[in-house]
Amino acid sequence: MDEKYSSNVISSGKLGRVEAPNARLTRYIVLLYFTKMLKAFGIFESYDILKVVHIVQFLFILKMGCAVILVFFQKPFSSGKMIPKRQWIKILKHAVISCIISLLGFFGLTLCGPLRSLLLFEHSDLVVISLLSVLFTSSGGGPSKTRGAAFFIIAVICLLLFDNDDLMAKMAEHPEGHHDSALTHALYTGIAFLGVADHKGGVVLLVLALCLKVAFNTASRKLSVEIGGAKRLYALSNLVSAVVLLPWVIVLSATTESKVESWSGLIFPFAMIIFSVMILDFYVESICMAKLETSRCARYGAIFLFLNGLLLANFWTHPLTGQIRAISTTGQQSSTEHVLSGGVLVSACFFIMADSILSAPSSKGQKGTLVGYSPEGTPLYNFMGDALQHTSQSLPRFIKDSLKQILEEYDSRQIFYFLCLNLAFTFVELFYGVWTNSLGLISDGFHMLFDCSALVLGLFAALMTRWKATRIYSYGYGRVEILSGFINGLFLMVIAFFVFVESVTRLVDPPNINTDMLTPVSVGGLIVNLVGICAFSHAHSHGASKGSCSGHDHGHSHHGHGHSSMEHSHGGHGHSHGGHGHSHGHGHSHSSGGMNANMRGVFLHVLADTLGSVGVIISTILIRQFGWLIADPICSLFISTLIFLSVIPLLKDACEVLLLRMPPQHEKELNFALEKIQKIEGVLSYRDPHFWRHSASVIAGTIHLQLMSDVVEQRVIQQVSAVLKDAGVNNLTIQLEKEAYFQHMSGLSSGFHEVLTMTQQMESMKYYKDGTCIM
């Protein structure tokens, strides 16, 4: 069979997107790199020119220069069909909106500087649309897209909060006299109304302009098709924009004083900006999108632009760079504002990662119908639909659904309320510590923040236990609460150990302690933790009956969903096996071994904090009244010992569950149940009984039963399921074995010793036809 018609097309990777050879793509990637480098240089040059040229005049020159070149080369009037009047009105609207977006972008450039403008405004439409779809739709593209959206938001936050821009220099350059037109005055007034600095207002303005630009480009696609192509629309729109701006420029030239000493010195800078920013970038990006994938073009373009922007920002004020751009200087001294900072570097890294993720194509697997097999035995599928993978929810919807699930159940609701209270106290403590410059308050606030991580772990575990079972996690996620309790217990043991070691060290050499703020902080922490103890003590004392219900008065009846076994006969062997008896919701109360380990771990964390607050209050009183500095390490020793001793039972119970130990509180009932099973009519013996606790509310078990050849299997399954259900097992699997089963196992070439053991066990039990067994 010819290779192209073989069944190995899928495995050989020959089915899918047809890609050009890498050597042919390299030239376009190199071209895109140099284009983005020139565009970054043009943006930096634009920032310098905007210091002396009014923003409206600057935009008019760019639009007019771009229109002249495009009309000459593109010939939008002679090529293509004639444009009717209705289309000219649409072009006029397109040009006006384009001018507004460009004005916002260039004004943001004057506020934030060239590098930050590149990072905020120069993103592909694909990236922004992917970001918005993650945030506001249910088809965001999976966890990777959500991660990319998070990186993008973090990058913007870094520019807002951690970018230490030279605000003092900006304030010195921004007196009221700088408002040389109504437009700039209105924009500055709007930013001042927000109550933020010009730099932060510029960040917000550029983000808004970016969203408007993407929406504008998306809406313009239909118009470009009607006009006769995007290039023709671009040429006509720039020409109309220049015509619209011309009266405004004439009025500004007549009413304002120009800061330009010589317009002839700006000819080359303007020509370079028009060529690199307005023309070259548009045409090269169109070519690369046609030759490369749109996602690859967007990803490479953003990375190249950001990296060149970082490079230029580092060397723009260097003397060598000044010599290179000496022909375009305007007589102004180079400014030192908008320099590189740690915040902008971190932001650039996050922007690069976000654009790389958000511009990547959504890889969706496909579900198909099995239509047959190839001669080699390879399955053949008919692909009809979308991916097997589930679409991820949008972030607001995910938060809303999670909060709804948290507030539905008692345990998670209690943890959530206490977490909110704890976080509120933590941030108040941190704020007051920063306000008063108290290192003790700040350190205690971060300690409380660490404690909140244990509550978050417990809350997440309580939420996961209600997730539905999947094909991979067929038992569900009930055991997550055990893992949460185990991890919280380990955290507490580590904390207790380090507190104990530090206390022993301080016993030898007690340090001086500043007790000024200890008492109010400890009293506040004690009040918060007492609320937590009251909230979690019920769960701590009631155990699994609390962990498996939603409220205090909810219980499970004995309706017991039973699934009878299916009898499988194989080729005349008469082999029957496997009984599944799932019965949910027994009415037995459990002792501490079956209690909710997750809630126990949370309770012990709160108890440890409470003991710590009590210890601090006692030691503070003793130090203030009697000067006993040794009281602090003694209280710490006592508290760490209590924490350690209280955690041991939790770790012991969690380890027993994780090691699949038979539940201790059910051990006697299970042994008695096995004796009753031995006496059921038709049961010869049993082997391999396994019983373990899966979670606080689920006890699982498996057992093999040897039966007489003429017994009714369903009756035996029903009786055995009832016996083990009374013993507390609510997830049961039964395998029935008759004489034909051993013959079948021998035919399948099972292990000799296994078959021999089972055969000897069967032969040792002789029984009459009436069912009387003789051992």
UniProtKB/Swiss-Prot annotation:
GO cellular component, one term: endoplasmic reticulum membrane
Disulfide bonds: none
Origin superkingdom: Eukaryota
InterPro entries xrefs: Cation_efflux (IPR002524), Cation_efflux_TMD_sf (IPR027469), Msc2-like (IPR045316)
GO molecular-function terms, A-Z: metal ion binding; zinc ion transmembrane transporter activity; zinc:proton antiporter activity
Cytoplasmic face residues: 1-28, 74-94, 138-148, 211-232, 285-299, 360-414, 466-479, 538-602, 649-775
Subunit-structure text: Heterodimer with SLC30A6/ZNT6; form a functional zinc ion transmembrane transporter.
Annotated protein name in UniProt: Proton-coupled zinc antiporter SLC30A5
Gene that this sequence comes from: slc30a5
